[in-house]
Curated annotation (Swiss-Prot):
This is Large ribosomal subunit protein bL25. It comes from Borreliella burgdorferi (strain ATCC 35210 / DSM 4680 / CIP 102532 / B31) (Borrelia burgdorferi). Keywords: Ribonucleoprotein, Ribosomal protein, RNA-binding, rRNA-binding. GO terms for biological process: translation. GO terms for molecular function: 5S rRNA binding; structural constituent of ribosome. InterPro entries: Rbsml_bL25/Gln-tRNA_synth_N, Ribosomal_bL25/Gln-tRNA_synth, Ribosomal_bL25_b-dom, Ribosomal_bL25_C, Ribosomal_bL25_long, Ribosomal_L25_dom, Ribosomal_uL5_bac-type. Part of the 50S ribosomal subunit; part of the 5S rRNA/L5/L18/L25 subcomplex. Contacts the 5S rRNA. Binds to the 5S rRNA independently of L5 and L18. This is one of the proteins that binds to the 5S RNA in the ribosome where it forms part of the central protuberance. GO terms for cellular component: cytosolic large ribosomal subunit. Belongs to the bacterial ribosomal protein bL25 family. CTC subfamily.
Length: 182
């Protein structure tokens, strides 16, 4: 397992706001895991480990929660952050089966300076995200679209996107335009 995705956790049997304050006082984050038709699990994670490994995370960031006995494949469903200190004080994780493909929307990240724009064309972005299908651990956080070769008057279609090998397009119409340069 890719170590950068693994997050150590400990299960907890006591919960509530006073218990959550005690957990935070120990520089830990109270959290819950739900999904897969299982009961909600309450746990705690070290805030230093979470902040170090996942300083920036998206809806598509896959984590592996490891309590020493069981590894659970999860997404961050919600993270409550203190506005003043910018510290995360509670996390909701959503568990998925790592062996079952899922469909998720992934942002399209535009890179490069288009030839068409350099010639005075106007770039119009029609889709900012694309629906893809993959196993959870293969899910990209974004899809890059290199605009460098796109000329004035050209467009890029969904089917033109370069996807990682284990990721497939899950959109109904692969001929939809992503960007146009007029």
């Amino acid at each position: 397992m890719e170590n950068s995705r693994v997050l150590s956790c400990q299960y907890r049997s006591s919960f509530g706001s006073s218990n959550a304050r005690r957990i935070r006082a120990k520089s830990e984050i109270p959290a819950v895991v739900y999904g897969q038709g299982k009961d909600v699990s309450h746990l705690r994670i070290k805030s230093s480990e979470f902040n170090k490994k996942f300083a920036k995370f998206t809806d598509n960031t896959v984590l592996i929660l490891d309590d020493g006995k069981l590894e659970r494949c999860v997404f961050v469903k919600d993270a409550a952050e203190n506005i003043a200190s910018k510290l995360i004080y509670h996390i909701d994780f959503y568990e998925v089966d790592r062996n079952v493909e899922l469909e998720k929307y992934v942002p399209i990240k535009l890179i490069g300076a288009s030839i068409g724009v350099k010639e005075g064309g106007i770039l119009t972005v029609l889709k900012e995200q694309v629906k893809v299908r993959s196993l959870p651990l293969d899910l990209p956080e974004f899809i890059e679209l290199d605009l460098t070769p796109v000329n004035k008057g050209d467009s890029v279609l969904l089917k033109d996107l370069v996807l990682p090998s284990n990721v497939r397009l899950a959109e109904n119409d692969e001929n939809l335009e992503v960007v146009i340069i007029k």
